């Protein structure tokens, strides 16, 4: 009769062994090593520590039975981070919270307990750790099939969520696109699925509820007109609108936006950082020039150099009683090729600030001015005169005529002055056909025809 073999496999044997070893440690029996962390003593067994940590295995294997070697100092570990790891070695249960997770992660990395370190990293990346007690219930993750050991996570409200030590992929939170301080604006999207509010008042990261809707929104094509670039010539956005127009548009947007429209705006807003051009520091030095409005006194003083059509319209708009002075920061590149490029960047942004009456009266004049090409290069040089008062924003008169060397504080004045050297007279009277260099002269000439008629 053959020999019969019976094999018994106990699933609870490992847990019972760990429990008994933990009892021996708590009672102080058979403890052969002392761990000192921040002047606090912990008794443990070498075999358990060496089996759990490669750091302790390297330290303890091959040592002689010397009394002084039984005390091991851990200088780069805190008590708050070491106690959960010691409990994990004897119970296979890791208890962490928002207060000690940083210390536990640092201690696990130092002690070469990489499975625990990856678990802490997954907790920090997940949204479970940083949710408030008033938020939705935390999702519990299923235990891994290969590793049956579980990690208990203690949240702020005291609930424990079992998570496998392997910490499978947790649903990632969608990062919120944060604009720069100069471009930071209030952006509100009303959606029935997941309302999101991104504004300057919110400092905590917002989480979108539905990841499927986010993927669907990302798959939609992005409108090139809405995905605005971050920098414009001379700091002027060509889609800038008056304050009243912006308020009216925001009111219409918040009333009843469609689902597709809201989803498209979320996709455009999230992708704004990806479209941001990154330039190395020091590639191009920009000269910052603040354009101030012309007061009534300055207009009378500069009769010898009247303003152009665009600036006269801007001055008329700004001198209306009750209107606020409009100021714009211009970034003038020293590498600008010609005045024509400068004129395109400025004149395309200025008509949005003009009044309705001035736009209708001088629309033809603006078209003539935009079609003029100036064969002169813009020369911006620092002031060399010792008598001029230094300015914190740069030279007081950064714009210099390349023909006669006269300096101006405003680029519009330089363009008007250069028309004299070029001999171009783009402004023509509709009644008599007489041509003028400046729009102001044409405007005064038209008054004569109006008086005669």
Swiss-Prot record:
Modified residues (Phosphoserine): 135, 159, 161, 165, 191, 194, 199
Phosphothreonine PTM positions: 200
Bias (Low complexity) ranges: 304-318
Gene Ontology MF: a single term: zinc ion binding
Zn finger residue spans: C2H2-type: 399-421, 427-449
InterPro entries: BTB/POZ_dom (IPR000210), SKP1/BTB/POZ_sf (IPR011333), Znf_C2H2_sf (IPR036236), Znf_C2H2_type (IPR013087), ZnFinger_BTB_dom_contain (IPR050457)
Entries under Pfam families matching the protein: BTB, zf-C2H2
SUPFAM superfamilies recorded: beta-beta-alpha zinc fingers, POZ domain
Zinc-finger listed as a keyword: yes
Covalent link (Glycyl lysine isopeptide (Lys-Gly) (interchain with G-Cter in SUMO2)) residue numbers: 4, 290
Region feature (Disordered): 135-157, 241-266, 295-324, 336-366
Residues covered by the BTB domain: 31-98
Cell compartment(s), UniProt: Nucleus
Keywords: DNA-binding, Isopeptide bond, Metal-binding, Nucleus, Phosphoprotein, Repeat, Transcription, Transcription regulation, Ubl conjugation, Zinc, Zinc-finger
GO cellular component terms, semicolon-separated: nucleus
Composition bias type Polar residues, residue spans: 145-157, 352-361
PANTHER family in the cross-refs: AGAP004733-PA, ZINC FINGER AND BTB DOMAIN-CONTAINING PROTEIN 44 ISOFORM X1
Protein name: Zinc finger and BTB domain-containing protein 44
Organism: Mus musculus (Mouse)
Gene label: Zbtb44
